[in-house]
Amino acid sequence: TFGGINLEDIKAPECFEIERRLVEELEIPVMHDDQHGTAIITSAALMNAAEMMGKNISDMKVVVVGAGASAIACSTMYKELGVKNLIMCDSKGVIHKGRTDLNKYKKDFITQTDITTMNEAFTDADMVLGLSKPGTFTIEHIKLMS
């Protein structure tokens, strides 16, 4: 037999600490579906989109709208795949260096650009991943994309 743990519907940031502790203390696989399942599926979509557009992943502008467990896991995986221009937005807008209200997990995704607004984030974006509440972005934002 083979055992493992699948965590489900645990909100951020608590889910990161729970997962970390389980991984450290147990010798069985631990998966948080909200993080890892979403990251795997959307990474496949990102790779397919890059191929279809004839672009290198490292040259793509990726916007992640949402900053919970799924968004952080997806963004982490995208960086591992080579995305260099990743802009994360939470309920207060773009996660940028001028923000003073960020937890340690969001701080890892402070944009390395001068972008501070959603309109700037969406302008010429190659991909947008929406992992936030409905209405966070609009069709007007989509029209700003590549």
Predicted regions and their residues:
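Glycine-rich nucleotide phosphate-binding loop and flanking beta-alpha elements
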Residues: 11-13, 71, 135-137
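Glycine/serine-rich phosphate-binding loop and adjoining beta1-alpha1 elements at the start
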Residues: 1-60
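Short, well-ordered coil/turn residues at beta-beta hairpins
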Residues: 8, 130-131
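Glycine-rich phosphate/diphosphate-binding loop of Rossmann-like nucleotide-binding domains
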Residues: 40-129
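Short glycine-/acidic-enriched loop or helix-start segments at secondary-structure transitions
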Residues: 16-17, 74, 98, 138-140
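Rossmann-fold NAD(P) dinucleotide-binding segment
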Residues: 18-25, 115, 123-124, 133-146
